[in-house]
C-alpha cells in the first residue's frame, strides 16, 4: 500500500516551458547584478569563483550547461526569490495537481517533493504558485544535497527505514525512475504537454493526468 507520494516538479507538476522560458531567463538576466551586489556576503558565489568576475563567468557557464551543481542552484534560487516576492514570477501547476494532492492527503498519504532545484527554490515554487500557497500540503522536500536523482543511493536515503513499496515516485525522467525502481519504489512516468516525446516507456506506468492515481 502506497503511503508516500514523491513528486518531481519540472515536467511533472509544472510545465517545462515555465522553467525554461521564464525561470531560467529571469535568473540569467540578473547574474551580473546579483554578483555585483552580493559577492562578499554570498558563500555560494565565493565557492563559484575567487573573484566576482570569475564567479560571474562560472555562473554563466553552468547556466549554459544546464548544470545541477549545488552552489549554482543555490544562487539561482536566491535570484528567483526576489522575483517571486516582487510578484514578477508566479509558478505554473497543471490543473490536476492540487486536487490529486488533496485527495492523497485525505487518504492518509504524505506528499514529498524531490527536485534538482534547491529546497528553498522548491518552497518558493509552491508558495507562489498560480494555485496559491501550497506549502501546507507537503511533508518534506529533497534536492541534490541528498544525491543526484539518477542515483539509487538518493532514494535509499529518502526512504530511510520505511518500506520502499510504500512509496510512489512520479517523474517525467526515465533515468530517475529507473534508479527509484531499482530501490523498490513504485514508479510512474508522467507525460505532459511540452515534455520531450517518449519513445520507450521502459515498462513504467504512464500518467497523462494525476486523476489516474485514483481510478479503479
Swiss-Prot record:
It is found in: Cytoplasm; Nucleus. GO terms for molecular function: acireductone synthase activity; magnesium ion binding. Belongs to the HAD-like hydrolase superfamily. MasA/MtnC family. The lineage of its organism: Eukaryota, Fungi, Dikarya, Ascomycota, Taphrinomycotina. It catalyses: 5-methylsulfanyl-2,3-dioxopentyl phosphate + H2O = 1,2-dihydroxy-5-(methylsulfanyl)pent-1-en-3-one + phosphate. One of its GO terms (cellular component) is nucleus. Mg(2+) binds at residues 8, 10, 172. It is an enzyme of class 3 (hydrolase). Its cofactor is Mg(2+). Substrate binds at residues 115-116, 149. Its main location: cytoplasm. Monomer. Binds 1 Mg(2+) ion per subunit. Signal peptide: none annotated. This is Enolase-phosphatase E1. The keyword Secreted does not apply. GO terms for biological process: cellular detoxification; L-methionine salvage from methylthioadenosine. Bifunctional enzyme that catalyzes the enolization of 2,3-diketo-5-methylthiopentyl-1-phosphate (DK-MTP-1-P) into the intermediate 2-hydroxy-3-keto-5-methylthiopentenyl-1-phosphate (HK-MTPenyl-1-P), which is then dephosphorylated to form the acireductone 1,2-dihydroxy-3-keto-5-methylthiopentene (DHK-MTPene). Pathway: Amino-acid biosynthesis; L-methionine biosynthesis via salvage pathway; L-methionine from S-methyl-5-thio-alpha-D-ribose 1-phosphate: step 3/6; Amino-acid biosynthesis; L-methionine biosynthesis via salvage pathway; L-methionine from S-methyl-5-thio-alpha-D-ribose 1-phosphate: step 4/6.
Amino acid at each position: 500500500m502506497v503511503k508516500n507520494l514523491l513528486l518531481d516538479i519540472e515536467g511533472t507538476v509544472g510545465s517545462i516551458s515555465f522553467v525554461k522560458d521564464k525561470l531560467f531567463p529571469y535568473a540569467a538576466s540578473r547574474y551580473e547584478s546579483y554578483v555585483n551586489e552580493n559577492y562578499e556576503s554570498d558563500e555560494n558565489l565565493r565557492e563559484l569563483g575567487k573573484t566576482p568576475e570569475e564567479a560571474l563567468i562560472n555562473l554563466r557557464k553552468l547556466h549554459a550547461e544546464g548544470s545541477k551543481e549545488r552552489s549554482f542552484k543555490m544562487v539561482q534560487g536566491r535570484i528567483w526569490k526576489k522575483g517571486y516576492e516582487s510578484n514578477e514570477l508566479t509558478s505554473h501547476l497543471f490543473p490536476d495537481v492540487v486536487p490529486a494532492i488533496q485527495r492523497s492527503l485525505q487518504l492518509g498519504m504524505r506528499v514529498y517533493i524531490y527536485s534538482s532545484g534547491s529546497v528553498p527554490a522548491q518552497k518558493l515554487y509552491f508558495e507562489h504558485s498560480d494555485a496559491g500557497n501550497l506549502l501546507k500540503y507537503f511533508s518534506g522536500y529533497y534536492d541534490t544535497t541528498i544525491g543526484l536523482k539518477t542515483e539509487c543511493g538518493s532514494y535509499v536515503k529518502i526512504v530511510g527505514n520505511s518500506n520502499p513499496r510504500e512509496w510512489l515516485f512520479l517523474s517525467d525522467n526515465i533515468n530517475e525512475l529507473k534508479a527509484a525502481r531499482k530501490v523498490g519504489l513504485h514508479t510512474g512516468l508522467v507525460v505532459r504537454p511540452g515534455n520531450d516525446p517518449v519513445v520507450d516507456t521502459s515498462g513504467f506506468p504512464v500518467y497523462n493526468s494525476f486523476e489516474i492515481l485514483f481510478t479503479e
